[in-house]
């Protein structure tokens, strides 16, 4: 049987969410075909998580570990790190050198999609509509709140250019809030993206390809009790209503699912992805973000959409492992 590393953790605030996703993948993977191991990557080290809180250090020279005197090598890596080094391409580059196949897109695609500002500008070249934005590359970059509002108006969304799970994201409704929002975003990343706020219905759509098929998952409608779908709404029960399939017209559904499939190809994605959108009051489709390693916890969007489609996560994981 293949030894599968379910690679979790990471160096960002999303580490805890990654661990929950890894547990769900571990529970769902077909153990009659694969030997799954949860690998935890942190700044303190790389380890395989054993029973009774035991850990086995990873040999980074060949991505293996020793168990009961025997060297265990991995045949496949299912990457479930949200943020660096999994979502930005660093881990993919390491695995490419070792010739170990993995579940998601490669270095170039990950680099493009992890940088929200670059990804949005790249996709605009294909006609994808996104919010107007300004990128701040470093803390020392000086830009006045007045200039920001003059270009983008109010309200604004201020967020890390390279993060997820809504860490460091602020909705700004007043000029006095801008500088604090920028500082909060810089605490989560090296760049800050300031976007004009787009009112409307927030939705998200999952998609995956294997050797034999391509599947667009049902769309989920997101109704947050907060001003927008922030971290509190994402991970606190009762703060959000998630409706799958979304209560939108068939025409909009078809357009969004088709656009999702196109974006998958345009960015060179692999495995399962999820793309977030806003449907404006004028029924315009505005892309928010491409997630190349979406959350896989029991309550995450992708597992919800898989269930709504009448599909089986165990079978999908097998298809992905065998297709790459």
From Swiss-Prot:
Cofactor note: Binds 2 magnesium or manganese ions per subunit.
Residues noted as binding Mg(2+) 2 in the record, renumbered to the chain: 289, 291
Binding site for Mg(2+) 1: 276, 289
InterPro entries, per database record: ATP-grasp, ATP_grasp_subdomain_1, D-Ala_lig_Van_CS, D_ala_D_ala, Dala_Dala_lig_C, Dala_Dala_lig_N, PreATP-grasp_dom_sf
Protein's pathway: Cell wall biogenesis; peptidoglycan biosynthesis
Cofactor: Mg(2+); Mn(2+)
Reaction(s) the record says it catalyses: 2 D-alanine + ATP = D-alanyl-D-alanine + ADP + phosphate + H(+)
GO biological process: cell wall organization; peptidoglycan biosynthetic process; regulation of cell shape
Location in the cell: Cytoplasm
EC number(s) from the headed UniProt entry: 6.3.2.4
Domain ATP-grasp, first and last residues per copy: 120-322
Pfam hit, one: Dala_Dala_lig_N
Binding-site residues for ATP, renumbered to this chain: 149-204
SUPFAM superfamilies, alphabetized: Glutathione synthetase ATP-binding domain-like, PreATP-grasp domain
Highest taxon, organism lineage: Bacteria
Gene Ontology MF, one: metal ion binding
Keywords noted in UniProt: ATP-binding, Cell shape, Cell wall biogenesis/degradation, Cytoplasm, Ligase, Magnesium, Manganese, Metal-binding, Nucleotide-binding, Peptidoglycan synthesis
Gene Ontology CC terms: cytoplasm
Family, per entry: Belongs to the D-alanine--D-alanine ligase family.
Function: Cell wall formation.
NCBIfam families linked: D_ala_D_alaTIGR (TIGR01205), PRK01372.1 (NF002378), PRK01966.1-3 (NF002527)
Protein name: D-alanine--D-alanine ligase
Gene that encodes it: ddl
């Amino acid at each position: 049987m293949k030894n599968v590393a379910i690679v979790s953790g990471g160096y960002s605030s999303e580490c805890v969410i990654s661990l929950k996703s890894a547990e769900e993948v571990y529970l769902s993977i077909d153990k009659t075909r694969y030997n799954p191991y949860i690998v935890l990557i942190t700044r303190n080290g790389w380890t395989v998580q054993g029973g009774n809180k035991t850990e086995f250090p990873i040999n980074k020279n060949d991505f293996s570990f020793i168990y009961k005197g025997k060297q265990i090598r991995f045949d496949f890596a299912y990457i479930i790190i949200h943020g660096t080094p999994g979502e930005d391409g660093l881990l993919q580059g390491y695995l490419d050198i070792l010739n170990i196949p993995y579940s998601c897109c490669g270095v170039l695609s990950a680099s493009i999609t992890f940088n929200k500002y670059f990804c949005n500008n790249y996709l605009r070249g294909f006609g994808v509509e996104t919010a107007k934005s300004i990128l701040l590359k470093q803390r020392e970059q000086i830009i006045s709140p007045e200039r920001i509002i003059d270009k983008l108006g109010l309200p604004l969304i201020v967020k890390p250019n390279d993060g997820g799970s809504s860490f460091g994201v602020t909705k700004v409704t007043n000029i006095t809030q801008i500088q604090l929002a920028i500082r909060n975003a810089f605490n989560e990343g090296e760049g800050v993206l300031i976007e004009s706020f787009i009112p409307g219905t927030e939705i998200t759509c999952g998609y995956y390809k294997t050797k034999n098929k391509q599947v667009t998952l049902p769309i989920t409608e997101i109704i947050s009790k907060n001003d927008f779908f922030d971290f509190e709404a994402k991970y606190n029960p009762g703060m959000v209503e998630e409706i799958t399939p979304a209560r939108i017209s068939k025409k909009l559904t078809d357009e969004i699912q088709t656009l999702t499939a196109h974006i998958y190809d345009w960015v060179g994605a692999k495995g399962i992805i999820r793309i977030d959108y806003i449907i404006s009051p004028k029924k315009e489709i505005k892309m928010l973000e491409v997630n190349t390693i979406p959350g896989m916890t029991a309550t995450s969007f992708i597992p919800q959409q898989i269930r709504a489609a009448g599909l089986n996560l165990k079978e999908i994981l097998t298809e992905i492992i065998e297709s790459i």
